[in-house]
Amino acid sequence: MSNYFSMEAFDYDDIQLVPNKCIIKSRSEADTGVKFGSRTFKIPVVPANMESVIDEDLAIWLAEHGYYYVMHRFYPEKRADFIKMMHDKGLFASISVGIKDSEYDFIDYLAKENIIPEYTTIDVAHGHSDYVIKMIKYIKEKLPDTFLTAGNIATPEAVRELENAGADATKVGVGPGRACITKLKTGFGTGGWQLAALRMCSKAARKPLIADGGIRHNGDIAKSVRFGASMVMIGSLFAGHEESPGNLITIDGKRYKQYWGSASEVQKGAYRNVEGKQMLVPYRGSIKDTLREMQEDLQSSISYAGGKDLSAIRVVDYVIVKSSIFDGDK
């Protein structure tokens, strides 16, 4: 067994970052930009590539306004047209693929027709797999110019293997999200220790990591950056917006949006190998306001870290407080 697992396990609510001396007059001076692949984005945040979180219209808006996105893979026949549409608009294309045999034909088609997405994500629940490694090598052979993210994984060994196979970034997180019940159905996952898993993986990583799942508050973004994330993928916090694809539902005068996991019965259309669930999340208005709030909160985090950009957060001290950060707030 790896000695990484002798480390103390902790999650977002167990950690507080320790402030340093502030060197900027206003948080507006703090730069939240992050380089990911060949592009620089406004903040290190990306909506989850789930059908209940992102659709084509939202992908267009995000790309137009300087945010990273990953389009989901649940309408595979539309992906090539999506890439062409984004390129016709002068925008970058970012798609998801799986590992089924038909996906190899799809990659061949993209290569043959020279329809090259700037970003590709291999989206598999258990990404530490021979079949994922095979797909990484195939995509890098056929589409060498695409920036390839692979996942999801939970261990340093998985990071090393996927990076060595050719992945340009790795997605960390097995079942910590609100709509995922992998930990309950299988007994496996990073639920309850997602932040510690990110820390372990960052010690092995030579390339960017995406922290995927378990984000409940904006401050968790800064904590993810502290423990090694270049990007933070978020589902439930983005699912309740006007632009979100889920249906708007009113119950007792309160508005909600539908949100479901990618391995849920809703997504699969059958009760078979279900590791996700459906839920309602409070309606939150426009996603523009949430993204602006996330950026402002992250600017405040940078000011507390004693720096001018995200690099300051990566080196701050932290304390483990064992879920006491909400004491006095309830």
From Swiss-Prot:
InterPro entries: Aldolase_TIM, GMP_reductase, GuaC_type_2, IMP_DH/GMP_Rdtase_CS, IMP_DH_GMPRt. One of its GO terms (molecular function) is GMP reductase activity. GO terms for biological process: purine nucleotide metabolic process. The keyword NADP applies. Coiled coil: none annotated. The keyword NADP applies. NADP(+) binds at residues 209-232. It comes from the Bacteria. The active site is at C180 (thioimidate intermediate). Keywords: NADP, Oxidoreductase. Disulfide bonds: none annotated. It is an enzyme of class 1 (oxidoreductase). It catalyses: IMP + NH4(+) + NADP(+) = GMP + NADPH + 2 H(+). Its EC number is 1.7.1.7. Gene3D superfamilies: Aldolase class I. One of its GO terms (cellular component) is cytosol. Catalyzes the irreversible NADPH-dependent deamination of GMP to IMP. It functions in the conversion of nucleobase, nucleoside and nucleotide derivatives of G to A nucleotides, and in maintaining the intracellular balance of A and G nucleotides. NCBIfam families: GMP_reduct_2, PRK05458.1. PANTHER family: GMP REDUCTASE. Belongs to the IMPDH/GMPR family. GuaC type 2 subfamily. HAMAP family: GMP_reduct_type2. This is GMP reductase.
